[in-house]
């Protein structure tokens, strides 16, 4: 029997979880072994629920709509990235209509087994001896990679934990190992610098894009 874990907040006019505190209080009242479906129909701040999901013992299904009007799938990818970085297992399922055979089959599998996996057979590592790397494009890629390792390609990252993106806290060693160290930047500082740009230069830059079809 499906039971909603939290009510719509009549004062706010929605049922979204609005803080880590609210998410923590919600999960404190949920059976820790109960199967949980996290329905995602829009972008959400994953850190409102992720810490509680890590401690939840029951199976977790991230369920999203597949509709560009309402970016639930994007929200699910963020939550999935957060849970992966926190080493918490979960299952994923999405649909455009929630009536298609693939969705029904996937939901039945999760309800029966408590987990759902998707086919990944199309993924495979590219070995150094692969024909792809011997091609012209492959050789260009090798040279670019060698250049990045030698000279570095510094990645500017605005407000690492912005919008609750735990998955935005990139592991430094992984980034440095591929020659792409992170420079942490502030959106507040960006706003200050933007205000220093004269209006005529702003308009000239905008015109540059518009004359090229943007």
Feature map (PLM): residue ranges:
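An N-terminal assembly and electron-transfer interface module characteristic of large anaerobic redox
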Residues: 1-214
